[in-house]
Amino acid sequence: MAKLIAFDQDAREGILRGVDALANTVKVTLGPRGRNVVLDKAFGGPLVTNDGVTIARDIDVEDPFENLGAQLVKSVAVKTNDIAGDGTTTATLLAQALIAEGLRNVAAGANPIELNKGIEAATQKTLDELRARATPISAPQEVASVATVSSRDEVVGKIVAEAMEKVGKDGVVTVEESQSLETTLDITEGISFDKGYLSPYFINDTDTQTAVLENPAILLVRNKISSLPDFLPLLEKIVESNRPVLIIAEDIEGEPLQTLVVNSIRKTIKAVAVKSPYFGDRRKAFMDDLAVVTNATVVDPEVGINLSEAGVEVLGTARRVTVSKDETILVDGAGDAEAVEARRQQIRREIETTDSTWDREKAEERLAKLSGGVAVIRVGAATETEVNERKLRVEDAINAARAAAQEGIIAGGGSALVQIAETLKAYAEEFEGDQKVGIRALAAALSKPAYWIAANAGLDGAVIVARIADLPNNEGFNAATLEYGNLVDQGVIDPVKVTHSAVVNASSVARMVLTTEASIVDKPAEETADHGHGHHH
């Protein structure tokens, strides 16, 4: 495939045009008076949204050189969304401003390497300032404020806060479509996994087609149970104690399974057998989690516990277990609260130390399962278009609330960034030459979110930014009420984690663009057919 190559100024200008194409589309959505963007979808109706990352993902630019720029900024939005789940519009805007400001200086003869050193120093200073300004939050109304700002909907804010309060900041909050017009919240306490009963003969509640066990003995086995002589001694002890039993093992086959089924039909025993979920190390880790939650010991020959010799002391219990054909839910396990908390801390350490995204995601899932219940927010609306739009906002709100609970909040509306920009201008005086220029470039970029929030409200952004710069910490401009004041008290707040990742990702992409000397793209095929040569402007 033939390539087209553009060098220095041409390459950078092409990239900047692509950056602008994407960022200008996204920035109209910023702030309480921001607008929506309509996306044409190949399937179903058009999607109306103000979610930055959803819009960014949809944009590809025709000119291949410009498209490089668009894709680079798209990566800022996507990465910010992956880390913090919100703040994608702010990140896109910061990247655009920083790239434009930086390229202007490069065109005027600044050294890109020195500029980058300045931007890097300024980024670090900004992060330090953000941390210094952070206010920790815990009260439900503070969480509700964060969620309300993110979703622009008070009802959603309250529901998200309630969900977080019930399941904790590490708990699972899922979003589903509601069958009604109302948006509602359901909480299920306990730990669940996606495996159901091995035989429908275990069902004892025919209305719901589930097996329900009250205060059962819970037997956890690391390997397969395939030998009846090994299994029978422990099973007989359980039958003698007159308790129902839940058995979770890698698999239960042959005679042991037949024995359980036959005795369940005869009602001599109330039992359910379930395969353990996942594979390999994940399965092992999850079984160990279950053991802690239910106060059981996993039967595992590797650690010297054989099924044939195991006594009732290996059994755990829970208040209630419900098993459907594809899910098992254990409610109120008998595990010691301190042991469960120690297990959570161990998983948190794994999350912090692992380099693999996949491992981290799986560990986060385990942490969420261990952190108590599962909250389900069912989103209702009159039309499918509206439901989809609202679901995106609810997901943003959950992410924002979680981020705020983790790292605290700052004044929203871009105000904190404007004030940090003032600090950067003073900080720049400690540097020389192009490094100083780099620090000033980030300072200029940091005022852009506040500028566009004001501009989207139909006001003069420059005037408002100048006024915010003189205000003390936590004060700024509220674009919803069009008044200045203490934004934290008014509930106009941003999670530090969201702003933090927006700044880091924008700075990272801008530094890459500033040091770009050439861009290479595939030569468009139809051009060769028509003219025998590619052209580029």
UniProtKB/Swiss-Prot annotation:
A GO BP annotation: protein refolding
Family matches, as PANTHER family: 60 KDA HEAT SHOCK PROTEIN, MITOCHONDRIAL
Organism: Corynebacterium efficiens (strain DSM 44549 / YS-314 / AJ 12310 / JCM 11189 / NBRC 100395)
Keyword list, A-Z: ATP-binding, Chaperone, Cytoplasm, Isomerase, Nucleotide-binding
Enzyme class: isomerase
E.C. numbers: 5.6.1.7
Protein name, per record: Chaperonin GroEL 1
Annotated family: Belongs to the chaperonin (HSP60) family.
GO MF annotations, alphabetized: ATP binding; ATP-dependent protein folding chaperone; isomerase activity; unfolded protein binding
